[in-house]
Amino acid sequence: MQCCGLVHRRRARVSYGSADSYTSRPSDSDVSLEEDREAVRREAERQAQAQLEKAKTKPVAFAVRTNVSYSAAHEDDVPVPGMAISFEAKDFLHVKEKFNNDWWIGRLVKEGCEIGFIPSPVKLENMRLQHEQRAKQGKFYSSKSGGNSSSSLGDIVPSSRKSTPPSSAIDIDATGLDAEDNDIPANHRSPKPSANSVTSPHSKEKRMPFFKKTEHTPPYDVVPSMRPVVLVGPSLKGYEVTDMMQKALFDFLKHRFEGRISITRVTADISLAKRSVLNNPSKHAIIERSNTRSSLAEVQSEIERIFELARTLQLVVLDADTINHPAQLSKTSLAPIIVYVKISSPKVLQRLIKSRGKSQAKHLNVQMVAADKLAQCPPELFDVILDENQLEDACEHLADYLEAYWKATHPPSSSLPNPLLSRTLATSTLPVSPTLASNSQGSQGDQRTDRGAPGRSASQAEEEHCPEPVKKAQHRSSTQHHNHRSGTSRGLSRQETLDSETQESRDSAYAEPKEEYSHEHADHYAPHRDHNHREEPHGGGEHRHREPRHRSRDPDREQDHNESNKQRSRHKSKDRYCDKDGEGLSRRRNEAADWNRDVYIRQ
Protein backbone atom coordinates (compact mmCIF):
# COMPACT_ATOMS: atom_id res chain seq x y z
CA MET A 1 0.00 0.00 0.00
CA GLN A 2 2.90 2.33 0.63
CA CYS A 3 4.17 1.68 -2.86
CA CYS A 4 0.84 2.56 -4.44
CA GLY A 5 0.68 5.80 -2.51
CA LEU A 6 4.13 6.75 -3.77
CA VAL A 7 3.18 6.02 -7.37
CA HIS A 8 0.02 8.07 -6.98
CA ARG A 9 1.95 11.05 -5.70
CA ARG A 10 4.39 10.77 -8.62
CA ARG A 11 1.52 10.67 -11.10
CA ALA A 12 -0.04 13.71 -9.50
CA ARG A 13 3.20 15.61 -9.86
CA VAL A 14 3.58 14.61 -13.49
CA SER A 15 0.02 15.53 -14.38
CA TYR A 16 0.38 18.90 -12.60
CA GLY A 17 3.59 19.68 -14.44
CA SER A 18 2.14 18.78 -17.82
CA ALA A 19 -0.91 20.95 -17.19
CA ASP A 20 1.29 23.89 -16.24
CA SER A 21 3.42 23.53 -19.35
CA TYR A 22 0.28 23.33 -21.49
CA THR A 23 -1.22 26.53 -20.09
CA SER A 24 2.10 28.51 -20.44
CA ARG A 25 2.50 27.65 -24.13
CA PRO A 26 1.47 30.68 -26.32
CA SER A 27 -1.26 30.17 -28.82
CA ASP A 28 -0.79 30.54 -32.55
CA SER A 29 -2.64 33.87 -32.53
CA ASP A 30 -0.31 35.24 -29.85
CA VAL A 31 2.74 34.18 -31.86
CA SER A 32 1.45 35.79 -35.03
CA LEU A 33 0.58 38.99 -33.16
CA GLU A 34 4.06 39.13 -31.70
CA GLU A 35 5.59 38.62 -35.13
CA ASP A 36 3.43 41.37 -36.60
CA ARG A 37 4.56 43.78 -33.91
CA GLU A 38 8.19 42.91 -34.55
CA ALA A 39 7.73 43.40 -38.29
CA VAL A 40 6.09 46.79 -37.74
CA ARG A 41 8.90 47.81 -35.40
CA ARG A 42 11.57 46.78 -37.89
CA GLU A 43 9.83 48.59 -40.73
CA ALA A 44 9.54 51.77 -38.65
CA GLU A 45 13.19 51.48 -37.70
CA ARG A 46 14.17 51.00 -41.34
CA GLN A 47 12.19 54.08 -42.40
CA ALA A 48 13.71 56.12 -39.59
CA GLN A 49 17.19 55.03 -40.65
CA ALA A 50 16.45 56.01 -44.25
CA GLN A 51 15.14 59.41 -43.17
CA LEU A 52 18.23 59.86 -41.04
CA GLU A 53 20.48 59.22 -44.03
CA LYS A 54 18.55 61.65 -46.22
CA ALA A 55 18.79 64.35 -43.57
CA LYS A 56 22.60 64.30 -43.74
CA THR A 57 22.57 66.29 -46.98
CA LYS A 58 19.75 68.63 -45.99
CA PRO A 59 20.53 72.20 -44.88
CA VAL A 60 20.35 73.22 -41.25
CA ALA A 61 16.83 74.43 -40.48
CA PHE A 62 17.76 76.22 -37.25
CA ALA A 63 20.10 75.99 -34.28
CA VAL A 64 19.46 75.87 -30.55
CA ARG A 65 21.48 76.33 -27.39
CA THR A 66 20.61 73.82 -24.68
CA ASN A 67 19.57 74.90 -21.21
CA VAL A 68 19.42 71.35 -19.84
CA SER A 69 21.54 68.24 -20.05
CA TYR A 70 20.31 65.00 -21.57
CA SER A 71 21.72 61.49 -21.52
CA ALA A 72 20.55 58.94 -24.06
CA ALA A 73 22.13 55.99 -22.25
CA HIS A 74 18.85 54.64 -20.88
CA GLU A 75 16.56 55.81 -23.68
CA ASP A 76 14.52 52.92 -25.08
CA ASP A 77 12.08 54.63 -27.45
CA VAL A 78 14.58 56.10 -29.92
CA PRO A 79 13.39 55.60 -33.53
CA VAL A 80 16.76 54.01 -34.32
CA PRO A 81 18.33 52.36 -31.25
CA GLY A 82 21.64 53.87 -30.29
CA MET A 83 21.21 56.97 -32.47
CA ALA A 84 20.01 59.42 -29.80
CA ILE A 85 22.29 62.38 -29.09
CA SER A 86 23.43 63.19 -25.57
CA PHE A 87 24.35 66.74 -24.63
CA GLU A 88 25.18 68.99 -21.72
CA ALA A 89 23.79 72.38 -20.82
CA LYS A 90 25.12 75.22 -22.97
CA ASP A 91 25.84 72.93 -25.92
CA PHE A 92 24.77 73.89 -29.43
CA LEU A 93 22.65 71.73 -31.73
CA HIS A 94 21.99 71.98 -35.46
CA VAL A 95 18.46 70.80 -36.23
CA LYS A 96 17.80 69.48 -39.74
CA GLU A 97 14.13 68.55 -39.54
CA LYS A 98 11.33 67.29 -37.32
CA PHE A 99 10.93 63.50 -37.23
CA ASN A 100 7.82 63.33 -35.04
CA ASN A 101 6.38 65.06 -32.01
CA ASP A 102 9.02 63.58 -29.71
CA TRP A 103 12.15 63.62 -31.83
CA TRP A 104 14.07 65.96 -34.09
CA ILE A 105 16.86 65.04 -36.49
CA GLY A 106 20.08 66.98 -36.03
CA ARG A 107 23.58 66.86 -34.63
CA LEU A 108 25.70 68.20 -31.82
CA VAL A 109 27.94 71.05 -32.99
CA LYS A 110 31.23 69.35 -32.22
CA GLU A 111 33.89 67.96 -34.47
CA GLY A 112 33.37 64.25 -35.07
CA CYS A 113 29.69 64.22 -34.04
CA GLU A 114 27.35 62.79 -36.65
CA ILE A 115 23.64 63.19 -37.20
CA GLY A 116 21.16 61.56 -34.85
CA PHE A 117 17.90 62.02 -32.97
CA ILE A 118 17.40 64.94 -30.60
CA PRO A 119 14.59 64.96 -28.02
CA SER A 120 12.03 67.63 -28.76
CA PRO A 121 10.94 70.16 -26.12
CA VAL A 122 7.69 68.22 -25.73
CA LYS A 123 9.58 65.04 -24.87
CA LEU A 124 11.92 66.82 -22.47
CA GLU A 125 8.95 68.42 -20.74
CA ASN A 126 7.28 65.03 -20.32
CA MET A 127 10.51 63.62 -18.94
CA ARG A 128 10.71 66.50 -16.47
CA LEU A 129 7.14 65.91 -15.29
CA GLN A 130 7.82 62.20 -14.82
CA HIS A 131 10.96 63.02 -12.89
CA GLU A 132 9.07 65.40 -10.62
CA GLN A 133 6.36 62.81 -10.07
CA ARG A 134 8.90 60.23 -8.99
CA ALA A 135 10.59 62.80 -6.77
CA LYS A 136 7.29 63.64 -5.06
CA GLN A 137 6.56 59.98 -4.52
CA GLY A 138 10.01 59.49 -3.03
CA LYS A 139 9.47 62.46 -0.75
CA PHE A 140 6.09 61.10 0.35
CA TYR A 141 7.51 57.67 1.17
CA SER A 142 10.51 59.10 3.00
CA SER A 143 8.34 61.41 5.12
CA LYS A 144 5.93 58.56 5.81
CA SER A 145 8.77 56.39 7.04
CA GLY A 146 9.77 59.09 9.52
CA GLY A 147 12.59 60.65 7.55
CA ASN A 148 13.84 64.13 8.30
CA SER A 149 12.12 66.79 6.19
CA SER A 150 15.36 68.69 5.68
CA SER A 151 17.17 65.64 4.37
CA SER A 152 14.34 64.81 1.98
CA LEU A 153 14.43 68.34 0.63
CA GLY A 154 18.15 68.08 0.19
CA ASP A 155 17.66 64.90 -1.81
CA ILE A 156 15.09 66.45 -4.11
CA VAL A 157 16.62 69.82 -4.79
CA PRO A 158 19.96 68.66 -6.25
CA SER A 159 18.25 66.10 -8.45
CA SER A 160 15.77 68.65 -9.74
CA ARG A 161 18.51 71.18 -10.38
CA LYS A 162 20.30 68.74 -12.68
CA SER A 163 17.55 69.09 -15.24
CA THR A 164 17.46 72.89 -15.06
CA PRO A 165 20.04 75.33 -16.34
CA PRO A 166 22.20 77.64 -14.24
CA SER A 167 20.38 80.73 -13.13
CA SER A 168 22.40 82.85 -15.54
CA ALA A 169 20.71 81.05 -18.43
CA ILE A 170 17.17 81.51 -17.14
CA ASP A 171 14.81 83.03 -19.67
CA ILE A 172 13.48 86.03 -17.77
CA ASP A 173 10.20 86.07 -19.64
CA ALA A 174 9.53 82.42 -18.97
CA THR A 175 10.19 82.74 -15.26
CA GLY A 176 8.46 86.05 -14.77
CA LEU A 177 11.56 87.59 -13.23
CA ASP A 178 12.79 91.05 -14.14
CA ALA A 179 16.37 91.72 -15.09
CA GLU A 180 17.08 93.03 -11.59
CA ASP A 181 15.64 89.91 -9.98
CA ASN A 182 17.69 87.68 -12.20
CA ASP A 183 21.00 89.25 -11.18
CA ILE A 184 20.99 87.59 -7.78
CA PRO A 185 24.36 86.58 -6.32
CA ALA A 186 25.28 82.98 -6.87
CA ASN A 187 25.27 82.17 -3.16
CA HIS A 188 21.65 83.35 -2.91
CA ARG A 189 20.36 81.82 -6.13
CA SER A 190 20.24 78.14 -5.28
CA PRO A 191 20.40 77.62 -1.51
CA LYS A 192 21.30 74.03 -0.85
CA PRO A 193 20.96 72.69 2.69
CA SER A 194 23.95 70.89 4.07
CA ALA A 195 23.77 67.55 5.78
CA ASN A 196 24.13 69.08 9.25
CA SER A 197 21.77 72.02 8.80
CA VAL A 198 18.21 72.06 10.05
CA THR A 199 15.67 73.56 7.67
CA SER A 200 12.54 75.14 9.07
CA PRO A 201 9.26 75.00 7.14
CA HIS A 202 9.31 78.80 6.82
CA SER A 203 12.71 78.84 5.14
CA LYS A 204 11.63 75.97 2.93
CA GLU A 205 8.69 78.04 1.68
CA LYS A 206 11.06 80.85 0.78
CA ARG A 207 13.30 78.55 -1.21
CA MET A 208 10.72 76.70 -3.21
CA PRO A 209 9.59 79.62 -5.45
CA PHE A 210 13.07 79.76 -6.96
CA PHE A 211 12.88 76.13 -7.98
CA LYS A 212 9.33 76.49 -9.23
CA LYS A 213 10.34 79.36 -11.48
CA THR A 214 13.30 77.53 -12.95
CA GLU A 215 11.02 74.64 -13.87
CA HIS A 216 9.48 76.78 -16.61
CA THR A 217 12.80 77.47 -18.29
CA PRO A 218 12.61 76.30 -21.91
CA PRO A 219 15.01 73.46 -22.67
CA TYR A 220 16.25 75.16 -25.84
CA ASP A 221 16.92 78.73 -26.95
CA VAL A 222 16.90 79.42 -30.69
CA VAL A 223 20.22 80.96 -31.74
CA PRO A 224 21.88 81.76 -35.10
CA SER A 225 23.01 78.72 -37.06
CA MET A 226 26.55 80.14 -36.97
CA ARG A 227 27.56 81.95 -33.80
CA PRO A 228 28.57 85.50 -34.76
CA VAL A 229 32.09 86.60 -33.85
CA VAL A 230 32.32 89.83 -31.82
CA LEU A 231 35.61 91.55 -30.93
CA VAL A 232 36.00 93.43 -27.64
CA GLY A 233 39.03 95.21 -26.24
CA PRO A 234 41.65 96.19 -25.57
CA SER A 235 39.61 99.27 -24.62
CA LEU A 236 36.63 101.23 -25.93
CA LYS A 237 35.64 101.17 -29.57
CA GLY A 238 35.74 104.58 -31.12
CA TYR A 239 39.28 105.33 -30.01
CA GLU A 240 42.29 104.84 -32.22
CA VAL A 241 44.06 102.10 -30.28
CA THR A 242 41.08 99.75 -30.20
CA ASP A 243 39.95 100.54 -33.74
CA MET A 244 43.41 100.05 -35.21
CA MET A 245 44.01 96.68 -33.57
CA GLN A 246 40.57 95.37 -34.46
CA LYS A 247 40.90 96.63 -38.03
CA ALA A 248 44.07 94.58 -38.45
CA LEU A 249 42.18 91.47 -37.32
CA PHE A 250 39.25 92.21 -39.62
CA ASP A 251 41.61 92.55 -42.58
CA PHE A 252 43.26 89.25 -41.72
CA LEU A 253 39.96 87.38 -41.36
CA LYS A 254 38.63 88.86 -44.59
CA HIS A 255 41.47 87.33 -46.61
CA ARG A 256 42.20 84.21 -44.57
CA PHE A 257 38.60 82.96 -44.79
CA GLU A 258 37.78 84.41 -48.19
CA GLY A 259 34.69 82.70 -49.56
CA ARG A 260 33.70 81.44 -46.11
CA ILE A 261 33.09 84.63 -44.13
CA SER A 262 30.77 87.64 -43.94
CA ILE A 263 32.04 90.69 -42.08
CA THR A 264 29.18 93.09 -41.46
CA ARG A 265 28.87 96.32 -39.56
CA VAL A 266 26.23 96.80 -36.88
CA THR A 267 25.47 100.36 -35.83
CA ALA A 268 22.35 99.59 -33.80
CA ASP A 269 22.70 98.93 -30.09
CA ILE A 270 22.12 95.19 -30.19
CA SER A 271 22.60 94.99 -26.43
CA LEU A 272 18.93 96.04 -26.28
CA ALA A 273 17.94 92.78 -27.97
CA LYS A 274 17.28 90.97 -24.71
CA ARG A 275 14.64 88.30 -24.78
CA SER A 276 12.91 90.01 -21.86
CA VAL A 277 12.59 93.22 -23.88
CA LEU A 278 11.73 91.93 -27.34
CA ASN A 279 9.15 89.46 -26.02
CA ASN A 280 7.52 91.86 -23.56
CA PRO A 281 5.51 94.65 -25.24
CA SER A 282 5.09 96.49 -21.93
CA LYS A 283 8.82 97.24 -21.89
CA HIS A 284 8.91 98.63 -25.43
CA ALA A 285 7.66 102.07 -24.39
CA ILE A 286 10.28 102.29 -21.65
CA ILE A 287 13.08 101.59 -24.09
CA GLU A 288 11.68 103.99 -26.67
CA ARG A 289 11.50 106.81 -24.10
CA SER A 290 15.03 106.19 -22.89
CA ASN A 291 17.94 108.08 -24.36
CA THR A 292 19.15 105.34 -26.67
CA ARG A 293 20.54 105.81 -30.14
CA SER A 294 18.69 102.81 -31.55
CA SER A 295 14.98 102.08 -31.73
CA LEU A 296 13.66 98.62 -30.99
CA ALA A 297 12.52 98.27 -34.58
CA GLU A 298 16.05 98.91 -35.76
CA VAL A 299 17.45 96.47 -33.21
CA GLN A 300 14.96 93.79 -34.21
CA SER A 301 15.84 94.34 -37.86
CA GLU A 302 19.53 93.90 -37.12
CA ILE A 303 18.93 90.70 -35.16
CA GLU A 304 16.90 89.24 -38.01
CA ARG A 305 19.61 90.23 -40.46
CA ILE A 306 22.26 88.46 -38.39
CA PHE A 307 20.11 85.32 -38.22
CA GLU A 308 19.64 85.44 -41.99
CA LEU A 309 23.37 85.75 -42.60
CA ALA A 310 24.04 82.82 -40.28
CA ARG A 311 21.66 80.57 -42.23
CA THR A 312 24.22 80.37 -45.03
CA LEU A 313 26.58 78.57 -42.60
CA GLN A 314 29.29 81.09 -43.42
CA LEU A 315 31.40 82.56 -40.65
CA VAL A 316 29.71 85.76 -39.46
CA VAL A 317 31.82 88.54 -37.94
CA LEU A 318 30.12 91.59 -36.44
CA ASP A 319 31.81 94.97 -36.32
CA ALA A 320 29.50 96.18 -33.56
CA ASP A 321 29.99 99.80 -32.51
CA THR A 322 28.26 99.62 -29.15
CA ILE A 323 29.59 96.32 -27.79
CA ASN A 324 32.53 96.77 -25.43
CA HIS A 325 31.81 94.12 -22.79
CA PRO A 326 30.62 90.49 -22.96
CA ALA A 327 27.81 91.16 -20.49
CA GLN A 328 26.07 93.34 -23.07
CA LEU A 329 25.19 90.29 -25.19
CA SER A 330 24.84 87.66 -22.48
CA LYS A 331 21.02 87.91 -22.34
CA THR A 332 20.44 88.13 -26.07
CA SER A 333 19.68 85.27 -28.42
CA LEU A 334 22.83 85.81 -30.49
CA ALA A 335 25.10 83.48 -28.46
CA PRO A 336 28.19 85.18 -29.90
CA ILE A 337 31.80 84.04 -29.97
CA ILE A 338 33.44 86.73 -27.83
CA VAL A 339 37.05 87.46 -28.82
CA TYR A 340 39.00 89.50 -26.28
CA VAL A 341 41.87 91.50 -27.79
CA LYS A 342 43.96 91.95 -24.66
CA ILE A 343 46.93 94.10 -23.73
CA SER A 344 48.12 92.47 -20.54
CA SER A 345 50.13 95.40 -19.18
CA PRO A 346 48.21 98.59 -18.31
CA LYS A 347 51.44 100.57 -18.68
CA VAL A 348 51.82 99.42 -22.27
CA LEU A 349 48.23 100.42 -23.04
CA GLN A 350 48.71 103.78 -21.36
CA ARG A 351 51.87 104.58 -23.31
CA LEU A 352 50.21 103.40 -26.50
CA ILE A 353 47.24 105.74 -26.01
CA LYS A 354 49.54 108.67 -25.27
CA SER A 355 51.53 107.97 -28.42
CA ARG A 356 48.41 108.63 -30.51
CA GLY A 357 48.40 112.34 -29.78
CA LYS A 358 46.66 114.79 -27.48
CA SER A 359 43.21 114.05 -28.85
CA GLN A 360 43.50 110.45 -27.63
CA ALA A 361 45.46 111.18 -24.46
CA LYS A 362 42.66 113.51 -23.36
CA HIS A 363 40.41 110.46 -22.98
CA LEU A 364 43.05 108.30 -21.32
CA ASN A 365 41.12 107.68 -18.11
CA VAL A 366 37.99 106.52 -19.91
CA GLN A 367 39.95 104.03 -21.97
CA MET A 368 41.92 102.73 -18.99
CA VAL A 369 38.75 102.18 -16.95
CA ALA A 370 37.17 100.23 -19.81
CA ALA A 371 40.31 98.12 -20.18
CA ASP A 372 40.33 97.43 -16.44
CA LYS A 373 36.70 96.27 -16.52
CA LEU A 374 37.55 93.80 -19.27
CA ALA A 375 40.60 92.58 -17.37
CA GLN A 376 38.46 91.87 -14.30
CA CYS A 377 36.12 89.58 -16.22
CA PRO A 378 36.58 85.85 -15.58
CA PRO A 379 38.08 83.99 -18.54
CA GLU A 380 34.88 81.95 -18.88
CA LEU A 381 33.11 84.99 -20.34
CA PHE A 382 35.38 84.91 -23.39
CA ASP A 383 35.69 82.24 -26.05
CA VAL A 384 39.08 83.45 -27.31
CA ILE A 385 41.63 85.65 -25.53
CA LEU A 386 44.25 87.16 -27.82
CA ASP A 387 47.09 88.29 -25.55
CA GLU A 388 49.94 87.73 -28.00
CA ASN A 389 52.52 90.47 -28.63
CA GLN A 390 52.76 89.83 -32.37
CA LEU A 391 50.06 90.35 -34.95
CA GLU A 392 50.91 87.12 -36.74
CA ASP A 393 50.61 85.08 -33.52
CA ALA A 394 47.29 86.69 -32.59
CA CYS A 395 45.91 86.13 -36.08
CA GLU A 396 46.94 82.48 -36.13
CA HIS A 397 45.41 81.95 -32.68
CA LEU A 398 42.08 83.33 -33.86
CA ALA A 399 42.30 81.47 -37.17
CA ASP A 400 42.90 78.14 -35.40
CA TYR A 401 39.79 78.63 -33.28
CA LEU A 402 37.62 79.57 -36.24
CA GLU A 403 38.96 76.68 -38.31
CA ALA A 404 38.01 74.28 -35.53
CA TYR A 405 34.57 75.90 -35.31
CA TRP A 406 34.20 75.59 -39.08
CA LYS A 407 34.95 71.86 -38.91
CA ALA A 408 32.49 71.46 -36.04
CA THR A 409 29.70 73.11 -38.03
CA HIS A 410 30.56 71.45 -41.36
CA PRO A 411 30.90 67.67 -40.87
CA PRO A 412 32.25 65.57 -43.76
CA SER A 413 28.83 63.98 -44.27
CA SER A 414 27.35 67.37 -45.19
CA SER A 415 30.13 68.48 -47.52
CA LEU A 416 27.67 69.16 -50.34
CA PRO A 417 27.15 72.86 -51.19
CA ASN A 418 24.56 74.59 -49.07
CA PRO A 419 21.59 75.57 -51.27
CA LEU A 420 20.66 78.27 -48.77
CA LEU A 421 23.90 80.10 -49.52
CA SER A 422 23.23 80.81 -53.18
CA ARG A 423 19.51 81.30 -52.60
CA THR A 424 20.00 83.78 -49.77
CA LEU A 425 22.68 85.75 -51.55
CA ALA A 426 20.78 85.80 -54.85
CA THR A 427 17.35 86.75 -53.54
CA SER A 428 18.10 88.75 -50.41
CA THR A 429 20.39 91.74 -50.52
CA LEU A 430 19.17 92.66 -47.04
CA PRO A 431 18.25 96.26 -47.93
CA VAL A 432 18.13 98.87 -45.27
CA SER A 433 14.68 100.10 -44.36
CA PRO A 434 13.70 103.74 -44.98
CA THR A 435 13.60 104.25 -41.23
CA LEU A 436 17.19 103.11 -40.84
CA ALA A 437 18.34 105.20 -43.78
CA SER A 438 16.66 108.31 -42.46
CA ASN A 439 18.09 107.73 -39.00
CA SER A 440 21.61 107.35 -40.32
CA GLN A 441 21.31 110.55 -42.40
CA GLY A 442 19.15 112.53 -39.98
CA SER A 443 19.87 113.79 -36.51
CA GLN A 444 22.53 111.16 -35.93
CA GLY A 445 24.01 111.46 -39.38
CA ASP A 446 26.94 113.56 -38.18
CA GLN A 447 27.94 110.89 -35.70
CA ARG A 448 27.23 107.81 -37.78
CA THR A 449 27.59 108.91 -41.40
CA ASP A 450 30.80 107.06 -42.04
CA ARG A 451 29.50 103.85 -40.56
CA GLY A 452 26.92 103.46 -43.31
CA ALA A 453 23.72 101.48 -43.34
CA PRO A 454 23.84 97.91 -41.97
CA GLY A 455 21.97 96.41 -44.88
CA ARG A 456 24.31 97.92 -47.43
CA SER A 457 27.46 96.82 -45.66
CA ALA A 458 26.06 93.31 -45.33
CA SER A 459 25.41 93.09 -49.07
CA GLN A 460 28.93 94.31 -49.74
CA ALA A 461 30.32 91.69 -47.41
CA GLU A 462 28.28 89.03 -49.16
CA GLU A 463 29.71 90.06 -52.53
CA GLU A 464 33.07 88.76 -51.38
CA HIS A 465 31.91 85.15 -51.24
CA CYS A 466 28.95 84.96 -53.64
CA PRO A 467 29.17 83.25 -57.07
CA GLU A 468 30.30 85.32 -60.06
CA PRO A 469 26.84 85.74 -61.70
CA VAL A 470 25.36 86.90 -58.43
CA LYS A 471 28.35 89.14 -57.82
CA LYS A 472 27.89 90.92 -61.15
CA ALA A 473 24.18 91.44 -60.55
CA GLN A 474 24.67 92.84 -57.08
CA HIS A 475 27.66 94.98 -58.01
CA ARG A 476 25.53 97.27 -60.14
CA SER A 477 22.93 97.93 -57.46
CA SER A 478 25.43 98.27 -54.63
CA THR A 479 27.55 100.68 -56.68
CA GLN A 480 24.54 102.90 -57.35
CA HIS A 481 23.63 102.94 -53.69
CA HIS A 482 27.24 103.66 -52.77
CA ASN A 483 27.47 106.57 -55.20
CA HIS A 484 24.23 108.06 -53.95
CA ARG A 485 25.39 108.07 -50.35
CA SER A 486 28.84 109.40 -51.13
CA GLY A 487 27.30 112.49 -52.68
CA THR A 488 25.14 113.28 -49.65
CA SER A 489 27.44 112.38 -46.77
CA ARG A 490 30.34 114.43 -45.53
CA GLY A 491 32.93 111.75 -46.17
CA LEU A 492 33.54 108.19 -47.19
CA SER A 493 32.32 105.43 -44.93
CA ARG A 494 34.76 102.98 -43.44
CA GLN A 495 33.49 100.19 -45.66
CA GLU A 496 33.93 102.36 -48.75
CA THR A 497 37.40 103.29 -47.60
CA LEU A 498 38.35 99.64 -47.22
CA ASP A 499 36.89 98.75 -50.62
CA SER A 500 38.49 101.64 -52.49
CA GLU A 501 41.95 101.64 -50.95
CA THR A 502 44.76 100.12 -52.99
CA GLN A 503 47.46 97.81 -51.74
CA GLU A 504 49.92 100.71 -51.53
CA SER A 505 47.61 102.81 -49.38
CA ARG A 506 46.83 99.83 -47.17
CA ASP A 507 50.51 99.11 -46.61
CA SER A 508 51.21 102.78 -45.94
CA ALA A 509 48.71 102.67 -43.08
CA TYR A 510 51.09 100.32 -41.30
CA ALA A 511 54.43 101.73 -42.51
CA GLU A 512 54.02 105.51 -42.14
CA PRO A 513 55.73 107.32 -39.25
CA LYS A 514 53.66 107.88 -36.15
CA GLU A 515 53.12 111.61 -36.73
CA GLU A 516 51.75 111.06 -40.22
CA TYR A 517 49.92 107.87 -39.28
CA SER A 518 48.00 109.52 -36.49
CA HIS A 519 46.35 111.95 -38.93
CA GLU A 520 45.77 109.36 -41.64
CA HIS A 521 44.40 106.92 -39.09
CA ALA A 522 42.05 109.57 -37.75
CA ASP A 523 40.53 110.00 -41.21
CA HIS A 524 39.59 106.33 -41.17
CA TYR A 525 38.17 106.11 -37.67
CA ALA A 526 37.17 109.53 -36.36
CA PRO A 527 33.91 109.98 -38.32
CA HIS A 528 32.33 106.55 -37.87
CA ARG A 529 32.73 106.17 -34.12
CA ASP A 530 30.89 108.42 -31.70
CA HIS A 531 33.64 109.28 -29.22
CA ASN A 532 36.19 110.92 -31.48
CA HIS A 533 33.67 112.79 -33.57
CA ARG A 534 31.52 114.07 -30.77
CA GLU A 535 34.27 115.28 -28.44
CA GLU A 536 36.91 116.39 -30.96
CA PRO A 537 38.30 119.92 -30.53
CA HIS A 538 37.59 122.38 -33.34
CA GLY A 539 41.15 122.55 -34.54
CA GLY A 540 41.66 118.82 -34.78
CA GLY A 541 38.23 118.29 -36.30
CA GLU A 542 38.89 120.81 -39.04
CA HIS A 543 42.11 119.07 -39.96
CA ARG A 544 40.59 115.60 -39.85
CA HIS A 545 37.64 116.40 -42.06
CA ARG A 546 39.52 118.45 -44.60
CA GLU A 547 40.07 115.56 -46.97
CA PRO A 548 36.49 114.16 -46.81
CA ARG A 549 35.08 117.64 -47.51
CA HIS A 550 37.38 118.02 -50.48
CA ARG A 551 36.26 114.64 -51.78
CA SER A 552 32.59 115.46 -51.48
CA ARG A 553 32.94 118.63 -53.59
CA ASP A 554 33.25 116.63 -56.78
CA PRO A 555 30.94 113.62 -56.42
CA ASP A 556 31.21 112.52 -60.06
CA ARG A 557 34.97 112.26 -59.98
CA GLU A 558 34.78 110.55 -56.61
CA GLN A 559 32.29 107.98 -57.90
CA ASP A 560 34.43 107.02 -60.87
CA HIS A 561 37.52 106.86 -58.71
CA ASN A 562 35.88 104.69 -56.06
CA GLU A 563 34.31 102.34 -58.58
CA SER A 564 37.58 101.73 -60.41
CA ASN A 565 39.51 101.32 -57.19
CA LYS A 566 36.89 98.98 -55.78
CA GLN A 567 37.14 96.66 -58.77
CA ARG A 568 40.92 96.87 -58.84
CA SER A 569 41.34 96.14 -55.13
CA ARG A 570 38.89 93.24 -55.34
CA HIS A 571 40.89 91.61 -58.15
CA LYS A 572 44.11 92.26 -56.30
CA SER A 573 42.87 90.67 -53.09
CA LYS A 574 41.59 87.62 -54.93
CA ASP A 575 44.87 87.08 -56.79
CA ARG A 576 46.99 87.92 -53.77
CA TYR A 577 45.43 85.62 -51.23
CA CYS A 578 44.75 82.57 -53.37
CA ASP A 579 48.45 81.70 -53.12
CA LYS A 580 49.22 81.59 -49.43
CA ASP A 581 52.89 80.80 -49.96
CA GLY A 582 53.54 83.70 -52.31
CA GLU A 583 53.00 87.40 -52.09
CA GLY A 584 50.23 87.16 -49.50
CA LEU A 585 52.58 85.59 -46.98
CA SER A 586 55.14 88.36 -47.41
CA ARG A 587 52.45 90.98 -46.82
CA ARG A 588 51.36 89.23 -43.64
CA ARG A 589 54.93 89.27 -42.39
CA ASN A 590 55.22 92.99 -43.11
CA GLU A 591 51.99 93.62 -41.23
CA ALA A 592 53.28 91.57 -38.30
CA ALA A 593 56.41 93.69 -38.11
CA ASP A 594 54.41 96.90 -38.32
CA TRP A 595 51.95 95.67 -35.64
CA ASN A 596 54.91 95.07 -33.35
CA ARG A 597 56.33 98.53 -34.06
CA ASP A 598 53.16 100.63 -34.07
CA VAL A 599 50.75 98.86 -31.74
CA TYR A 600 52.76 97.33 -28.94
CA ILE A 601 55.29 99.57 -27.22
CA ARG A 602 57.90 97.77 -25.23
CA GLN A 603 58.22 98.66 -21.60
Swiss-Prot record:
Q: What are the Low complexity biased-composition ranges? A: 142-154
Localization terms from the record:
Cell membrane, Sarcolemma
Q: Which GO terms describe its molecular function?
A: high voltage-gated calcium channel activity
In the bilayer, the protein is annotated as: Peripheral membrane protein
Locations of Basic and acidic residues compositional bias? 462-471, 503-545, 553-566, 575-603
Q: Which residues carry this modification: Phosphoserine?
A: 149, 152, 163, 493
GO CC, one annotated term = L-type voltage-gated calcium channel complex
List keywords of the entry alphabetically. Calcium, Calcium channel, Calcium transport, Cell membrane, Ion channel, Ion transport, Membrane, Phosphoprotein, SH3 domain, Transport, Voltage-gated channel
PANTHER family the UniProt entry points to: VOLTAGE-DEPENDENT CALCIUM CHANNEL BETA SUBUNIT (PTHR11824)
Q: How does it assemble?
A: Component of a calcium channel complex consisting of a pore-forming alpha subunit (CACNA1S) and the ancillary subunits CACNB1 or CACNB2, CACNG1 and CACNA2D1. The channel complex contains alpha, beta, gamma and delta subunits in a 1:1:1:1 ratio, i.e. it contains either CACNB1 or CACNB2. Interacts with CACNA1C. Interacts with RRAD; interaction may be involved in beta-adrenergic regulation of heart rate and contractile force. Interaction with RRAD regulates the trafficking of CACNA1C to the cell membrane. Interacts with TMIGD2. Interacts with CAMK2D. Interacts with CBARP. Interacts with CAMK2A.
Protein name from the UniProt record: Voltage-dependent L-type calcium channel subunit beta-2
Which organism is the protein's source? Answer: Bos taurus (Bovine)
